[in-house]
A protein has these predicted regions:
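Short, flexible, mixed-charge glycine/proline-rich loop motifs
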Residues: 8-17, 57-63
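Short cysteine-rich clusters marking metal-coordination/redox-active sites
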Residues: 22-25, 69-72
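Short, charged amphipathic alpha-helical segments flanked by flexible coils
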Residues: 105-107, 155-199
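Short recognition patches in nucleic-acid-associated and regulatory proteins
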Residues: 2-7, 24-58
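Charge-enriched, short contiguous segments at helix-coil
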Residues: 189-247
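A long, hydrophobic alpha-helical segment
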Residues: 120-139
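Helix-loop junctions and short alpha-helical segments
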Residues: 71-72, 76-123
């Protein structure tokens, strides 16, 4: 699954619902059926139509939909809900027009934003799945889960979590754990990748300043890092290296 940032815009129209990857089988895509779509305008929004200055952009609706996996043997159903508003959009051929756009606040189970290698430890996968789900409702929390998954990745590589100081066990900062991992196992490029994920996670944890772009870039970096560290690519390279060493 190639990373496509446009797939993860914060809003889309009913006529252009993204074809997300199925969170269960990872093979099918989630299909939209208009018969499984509901949109309602609350009374406060309806009443506002009577205001002398009313504008279509005042409309504030709620929506819910089911997306079904295209793989016949899977058939997973994802529930999507959120708000809808009327906004001006631009078309190169027809010019500006008003269109109702859907802004998801929840997707359950959430589609995977990146491809996660099968060999990825379950503890890392669990944190990433939470990051995927929180992406739609709380970007800061999503960024924090990315950081937590890096902690679990360091656990997988048996990098120490605690050190004894003054007779007490104290947690080792993630910065130090990454440095230790790189010194023993990694490459300089992996150092940059992992520290970038740590920094984005810190933005989410401490200041809630992580933007949608920050989080998407972090996911993109993480996909590459996981593929190199524990995915098929790392296995293939390891085999090639072993073969060449025997010459």
């Amino acid at each position: 699954m190639a990373f496509d940032r446009e797939l993860w815009d914060d809003r889309f129209s009913v006529s252009a619902v993204p074809a997300f990857t199925c969170p269960r089988c990872s093979k099918g895509t989630l299909q939209f059926d208009k018969k499984q779509f509901w949109k309602v305008e609350p009374k406060f929004s309806v009443d506002a139509h009577g205001h002398e200055d009313w504008d279509p952009e005042w409309v504030d609706e709620r929506f819910a939909m089911f997306l079904k996996c295209s793989a016949e043997k899977c058939g997973e159903i994802v529930v999507v809900s959120g708000s809808a508003s009327v906004e001006q959009v631009y078309d190169e051929e027809y010019g500006p027009s008003m269109e109702s756009l859907l802004v998801p606040a929840m997707m359950v189970p959430a589609p995977p934003i990146i491809r996660v290698p099968e060999r990825t430890p379950q503890e890392v996968q669990a944190e990433l799945q939470l990051a995927f789900q929180l992406f739609w409702s709380d970007l800061g929390a999503s960024a924090t889960k990315i950081r937590t998954s890096v902690e679990r990745l360091m656990d997988h590589f048996k990098v120490a979590k605690f050190k004894r100081t003054g007779g007490k066990l104290k947690p080792i900062p993630l910065f130090t754990r990454i440095e230790t991992f790189i010194a023993k196992n990694g490459k300089v490029v992996h150092k940059d990748h992992l520290h970038a994920l740590r920094v984005v996670g810190n933005l989410g944890t401490h200041s809630n300043a992580a933007t949608r772009s920050d989080v998407l870039e972090a996911f993109q970096i993480y996909e590459h890092a996981l593929d190199e560290l524990i995915g098929k690519k790392s296995t293939v390279i390891a085999k090639l290296a072993k073969k060449l060493k025997q010459k």
